[in-house]
């Protein structure tokens, strides 16, 4: 079959497999690529190819991840699969692989296991909005009542973490049997289940809103004055669009936020009608003095984001080998928190009953910053000590 030209006409969605070790995440990933390849919608990737995931660095942390791509009649997908449990934790906390939806793989023979629970919790905390379930290894279970029991357990678990467990689509099948058969026909007992799963992913996980359609936000990286014209803030537009005449708010580092109007937008020293997500720009701000805007603040559409000092976070603490701490930290630990473009000192409060946090741990903690930062749930940050990264985190809830 001639290799098809990749066309960017279909909407794009990021997904990934999550679930307990050895429940079949990688086998399922291989099966999806094989079955879809029969319809010319993917390149088949073998288990071994996916399993030997290359190392990547995200925010100074080494993560092993495999990316595969495939499409259905409706959409184009990028799919991540991680070999080890620690890789999932790091991936989800750093946002190295932002998922619009996840395929939770649970062995019908074993039912939910500790990492099943931890991955659902992580998905909830880091903002993976949708989960669909593949009950794998159905060929190893003779009693249909057992499968129903596992299905009920999974729905319960999803409900516990505020996912709509009762309405979550669950597909029962066997990734291994589909791989072994490989006929790719919809009417096949095993291959058909992979098609059913892809239909569910197509229908149940919505196409995400594009960054460009979200409200404007730009982290300020630098500020300078243009004589006779005023103050310019530079940075990369994180989301939305901005044009001359737009009202923007300067937020962060103080409790007061100020509104101003954009009087000029420049990119590569040329004026621009409108800048959008991904552009590196300079924004000329009306009536703003050089000292009234600084690195670490953000420019945003008024009313869309607020400054906060107290929040709850999911944090991964780097190991010594990753360049992190060699020793644990305790309640009251005061490192720097690096948000977007700047470091802010903060104090850590550990959960009740947690004495200390060891390098390599994944923990929920509370933080109080000494100055407010423009913040919302899902915002990523690094924890630093003397300029080196010792942890990675994501804001899971705002306290005040």
UniProtKB/Swiss-Prot annotation:
Catalytic activity of the protein: GTP + H2O = GDP + phosphate + H(+)
Renumbered residue ranges of the record's region G5: 174-176
Family annotation (InterPro entries): EF-Tu_GTP-bd (IPR041709), EF-Tu_GTPase (IPR050055), EFTu-like_2 (IPR004161), EFTU_2 (IPR033720), G_TR_CS (IPR031157), P-loop_NTPase (IPR027417), Small_GTP-bd (IPR005225), T_Tr_GTP-bd_dom (IPR000795)
GO-annotated cellular components: cytosol
Positions of Mg(2+) binding: 26
Region G3, annotated ranges: 81-84
Residue numbers spanned by region G2: 60-64
UniProt binding sites for GTP: 19-26, 81-85, 136-139
Molecular function via GO: GTP binding; GTPase activity; translation elongation factor activity
Domain tr-type G: 10-209
Subcellular location, principal: cytoplasm
Stretches the record annotates as G1: 19-26
Annotated localization: Cytoplasm
EC number, UniProt record: 3.6.5.3
Record PROSITE patterns: G_TR_1, G_TR_2
Complexes and interactors: Monomer.
Record function comment: GTP hydrolase that promotes the GTP-dependent binding of aminoacyl-tRNA to the A-site of ribosomes during protein biosynthesis.
PANTHER family xrefs: ELONGATION FACTOR TU, MITOCHONDRIAL, ELONGATION FACTOR TU-RELATED
Family listed: Belongs to the TRAFAC class translation factor GTPase superfamily. Classic translation factor GTPase family. EF-Tu/EF-1A subfamily.
Protein name: Elongation factor Tu-A
Organism (species): Caldanaerobacter subterraneus subsp. tengcongensis (strain DSM 15242 / JCM 11007 / NBRC 100824 / MB4)
Gene responsible for this protein: tufA
């Amino acid at each position: 079959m001639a290799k098809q030209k990749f066309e960017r006409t279909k909407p794009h969605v990021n997904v990934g497999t999550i679930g307990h070790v050895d429940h079949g995440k990688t086998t399922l990933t291989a099966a999806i690529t094989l079955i879809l390849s029969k319809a010319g919608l993917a390149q088949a990737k073998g288990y071994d190819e996916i399993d030997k995931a290359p190392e990547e660095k995200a925010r100074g942390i080494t993560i092993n991840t495999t990316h595969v791509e495939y499409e259905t009649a409706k959409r184009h997908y990028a799919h991540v699969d991680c070999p080890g449990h620690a890789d999932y934790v790091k991936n989800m906390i750093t946002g190295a692989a932002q998922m619009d939806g996840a395929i939770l793989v649970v062995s019908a023979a074993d039912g939910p296991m500790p990492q099943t629970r931890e991955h659902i919790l992580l998905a909830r905390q880091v903002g993976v909005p949708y989960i669909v379930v593949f009950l794998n290894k159905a060929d190893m279970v003779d009693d249909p009542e057992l499968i129903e029991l596992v299905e009920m357990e999974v729905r319960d678990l999803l409900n516990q973490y505020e996912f709509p467990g009762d309405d979550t689509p669950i597909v029962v099948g066997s990734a291994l049997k589909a791989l072994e058969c490989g006929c790719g026909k919809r009417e096949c007992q095993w291959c058909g289940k992979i098609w059913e799963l892809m239909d569910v992913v197509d229908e149940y996980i919505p196409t995400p809103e594009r960054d460009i359609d979200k409200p404007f936000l730009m982290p300020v990286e630098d500020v300078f004055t243009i004589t006779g014209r005023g103050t310019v803030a530079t940075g990369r537009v994180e989301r939305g669009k901005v044009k001359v005449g737009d009202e923007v708010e300067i937020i962060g580092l103080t409790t007061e936020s100020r509104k101003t109007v954009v009087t000029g937008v420049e990119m590569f020293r040329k004026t621009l009608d409108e800048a959008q997500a991904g552009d590196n720009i300079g924004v000329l701000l009306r009536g703003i003095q050089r000292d009234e805007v600084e690195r670490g603040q953000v420019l945003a559409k008024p009313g869309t984001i607020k400054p906060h000092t107290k929040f709850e976070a999911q944090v991964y603490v780097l190991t010594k080998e990753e360049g992190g701490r060699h020793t644990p930290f305790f309640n009251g630990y005061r490192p720097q928190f690096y948000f977007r473009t700047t470091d802010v000192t903060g104090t850590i409060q550990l959960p009740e009953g947690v004495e200390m946090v060891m390098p390599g741990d994944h923990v929920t903690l509370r933080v109080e910053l000494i100055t407010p930062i423009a913040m919302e749930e899902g915002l990523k940050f690094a924890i630093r000590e003397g300029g080196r990264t010792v942890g990675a985190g994501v804001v899971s809830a705002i306290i005040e």
